[in-house]
Structures are given as C-alpha cells and as structure tokens.
Amino acid sequence: RSTRVRSSAASDVYKRQNVQYAQSALLMDMASGRVLYSKNLDERVYPASTTKIMTAILALEMGNMDDTVTATYDALKSITLEDSHMGILTGDELTLDQLVKGMLVYSANDAANVIAIHIAGSLDAFVDLMNQKAQELGMTGTHFVNPCGSHDDNHYTTARDLAILSKYAMKNDQFREIVKMPIYKIPATNKYASE
C-alpha cells in the first residue's frame, strides 16, 4: 500500500526531522517518483549500511534462498566486534534466506560478506556485480568497494542514486517483505542452538 504525501506534509517532515542538517536528502513519493524535497541530490556521500540494499537485491535476483551457505574465513576476516554483525563464525551453515534476513534486519556485515562470497566466489567479484548493477540502474554517482558499507573513500553514492536503488528494491516482493520485519530470530544452526 502506498501512502501519498502532500507537499505541505513534506515541508512538515523537513521541519520535524531536522532534515536541514543533513548533508544531502531526498523525499520522494515512491509510487509516482515525484520528488517532494531534495537537498544536494548529487553530492557524493558515504552510503554506510544502505549498501546492503544492493547486496540484498543481488542475492535475491541471483541466488537460491534455500541454498545452505557455509561461512568462510575469507568472508569473516575483515569483520570486527565494532561492526554490526550476527556473530557468524567460520564454518557456520545458514540458508541464503537466513543470511539476507539477518543482513537487512540486523544490518549484519558478516552476513553481507558471506552472501557476497556465496553469490560471486569472492568479495571482489561480488563488488564488480554491485557496480555493474548500479550502472544498469542508472546510478551514475555510485561506486562500491565492499558488500556491507564499511567506510572507504572510494565507496560512495548520492541521494539521487540511493532513491533509484530504493525504488528498484521496493519492487521486489521478497525485499519488501523482509524490510517490513521488525525482528528476525534465526533458527538453530550447525554451531548454535536456538534460544
């Protein structure tokens, strides 16, 4: 169900949410594509965890959600305790469905990396797919260097490009269902019992 926002309502959002302090912003009616408010649409910004939208879309489009995926050392070696994570360990077996849900609901960097290697064989190969998809979608101000959004000066996007990606992602039924989930409990794995 789409909610339409009047222009005056967009102005109210601007005032209430202190959007004026954002480096860049875009408020868009997703159904029509009409821009209700924008600020520095094409200014380069760091996407952080919104990167995971692209990772999820590639997993949903290229993967089989029933696949059992084994977490590898290569997928997990760059994840730190300070990162958002699910606590995946080398050798953990989860389905691709569990990984995508965990990545989107918990913003789990470890899940993003495990997904990337499962889909493309390596993090670098997956990043190539991310950049190809960005170009296909017309995201001309975007360049990815990792699947989880870890900061890197060469990992960037724009508010306009994030709107393009978000609008595309919301057309995917599975993606839409996952991002509506307020919480996701991962069932028992080969290494962890379910609580």
Model-derived features: positions:
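Active-site-adjacent loops and short helices of periplasmic peptidoglycan-processing enzymes
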Residues: 11-160, 164-173
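Single conserved hydrophobic/aromatic residue that forms the stacking wall/gate
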Residues: 1-10, 14
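Short, well-ordered beta-to-alpha junction loops that form the rim of enzyme active sites
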Residues: 5, 147, 180
